[in-house]
Amino acid sequence: MTKNDTCKRLLAAAAVLLAAAAMLHTLFVGLEIDEEYALSLGFRLVRGDRLFYSMWEPHQLSALPPALLIAVYTAVTGTTTGVLLFVRVTMLVLKAVLSVWFYRSLRAPLGRTNACLLALVLFVFTPKWFLGPDYVSQQFHFTLAAFLFFYGYYAPGPQQYRGLWRVAAGAVCACFSFLAYPQSAAAAPFLLLGLWLLDRAAPRRCGALLFLVSCAVCGGAFALWLLQGMGFDLPALLARAALILNDPQYDFTAGERLHTLAGQAAAVLQTCRVPALAAAAAVLAGVLSGRGSRPAPARLLERLLWYFTFFLTLWCTAHSLISVSLDFRHLYLAAALAGGWTFCCDRREVQHRTLRRLLFWLGWLPGMAAYLFILRSTLIALCTTFMYLFWPALCGAAALALKSPAAPHRRRQTQLLLLCMLLAAALPRLWLVQQTGWRCGTVREVAVQRITTGPAAGTWADEKAADMQECLYEALAPYAGQPVLQAIGEQHGLGFLMADGTLTVAQASVISGTDSDPRFEQYYTVLPEKQPRVILYDDAEVRDMAAFHTWLEQHFTITDRYTVQHGTASLQVLIVG
């Protein structure tokens, strides 16, 4: 073994250890409202709530995977205590499996080092910085699984065009991705087109047709299940779906959304200014140095875009740590755009042509289509939406790595870029801690406490979040089997999983604020059997809940009320007669 090989192995081991440390920190530390929401959705299904009938959640179509995990855990243990850690461990194992699968699939064309670095970036990345299977996480991971199944069928090699079951399995994964985040179904036509084009490369291939049939079967089966939950009353199902889709939070036009994004674009451009100047200087220096022949303008632009991605990755990593923020995902926008230009420049390259087409038609293009549709429909800020560009960015980076073995200095540059992408994903996870209220602090600033009871037992969170979990446990422990309403602006989804998982949810939605959603009142008129027996108020409420609290106390007979306190948390418990 040469000295160079030893250095490579040591660096690879260090990268693996860095990724493992980052994900272990994510596994045990931090608690965020959207992760709680994901588990509460699954819990509602486990406790007998039905989609659209008694669940009026905006993201209820993502409830199936967490419901399966919670059902398995409660069936084995008989309790929900510690279920959050179980779900996180399961997700971490699945991420590891997907990453190893990705590495084994692409190590031959990309090279071991490139494939390893990309797989580690894939392992460390989570869209919302927690491991729980919320709708965004499901959309990403099912998309990845679908691609890997399709890749296994179409990629050159001894198994090419063998095992049509791979296409069917990929279609099922794609359907779960669309179900988790329906806007991502915009990728479906491009997937179908890509499969059809790949089928044309060989006679008597029917991958596109099988994809279409599999999606139709999955969609039909899911529709029948929904209808069964509504008593096979199609008009009632359509009316309920229209009611839920008419969420006041999302009542904006395409023009209004475009105006909002345009206002936020200036800040994004300001962020990109310095890396863009550095990239231009690097390209200019390379041209003026006179080494080698001068590349064509298209290749110069490609080089500029990838240099820009490199410098922006460094900038995002530094500012994430310095500014104590998790929202510096701009590098994924740069990598996605650079990758798109690389696909364009290399479209006539003979080497790795099939692999390049796979990455483009089944990865980059569907990912970009899904992102544009999500961008139109989501409420989040422009810079936050860049998390949805990770998959196109990864496909673009893989396209860059496809040609790096032909030029040693380009190979080193590509590996340096991939290493920086790994650092950008891993270092903030090690240095920052997610806090209550979509904030974060450094590991030196945030004093984390171990949660010892309830569904989050065995994890650590900031003092406020940990105290609230303990307070919820103490407040709800006496009311096993009772329907609970949290009349709280910032819902605590894990609160419904207290009392060993015997509670039921007595409200329309766990995530839509009761202070701003008038459908909460309509819910009890349409479903009188869902009236609560226990109501919780948060004494440290961050929203104006006075009007809704007044409505509750006018429409429900309150027979008792008292306060439960634990550390910084204080809850009022109201008993309905």
Predicted feature locations:
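Hydrophobic alpha-helical membrane-interfacial segments at the cytosolic entry of transmembrane helices
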Residues: 12-18, 203-228, 267-283, 298-312, ...
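Short hydrophobic/aromatic helix or loop-helix immediately within or flanking a transmembrane segment
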Residues: 39-43, 54-81, 177
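Short periplasmic/luminal acceptor-recognition loop of GT-C membrane glycosyltransferases, typified by
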Residues: 57, 182-184, 188, 428-512, ...
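Transmembrane-helix signature of polytopic, membrane-embedded enzymes
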Residues: 97-124
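Membrane-interface alpha helices of multi-pass inner-membrane proteins
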Residues: 127, 163-182, 188-193, 216-217, ...
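Short acidic/glycine- and proline-prone juxtamembrane loop motifs at membrane-interface regions
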Residues: 131-140
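Specific aromatic-rich, kink-prone transmembrane helix
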Residues: 139-158, 166-174, 197, 335-339
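Perimembrane helix-loop-helix junctions
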Residues: 155, 187-223, 288-293
